[in-house]
């Protein structure tokens, strides 16, 4: 079985590093790149294969919602949104789910809690694996439906 190739998109270098470290605990996940904004993410996916994207909701240059729209337009890919636990962040996360994101995570805020909690680590890993699997099922059935229509 091939590794799940993950692109991390977050304006915080700290969060990018933390997510990389957490995801790479699982040998079936390979973080292929970590970029700081949506513009860099779009450029990356146009020339590099990615199975799952973790995407921050609030970023400069191109926010998570605009980035998600562009991802779904140019190269539909399963996206797990990361959001802070603010009201605005929650609203944007629900909008992202409507636009095609497959899941969301509350953005980790306490590195000491994260590094000592296997529940949080497992949750992040599980959501990335689920995103990859669910998206593959979606496209499998979508292609079958298109064939039936023809």
Pin down the residues of each PLM region.
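Strand-loop microenvironment adjacent to phosphate/nucleotide-handling motifs in alpha/beta enzyme folds
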Residues: 1-150
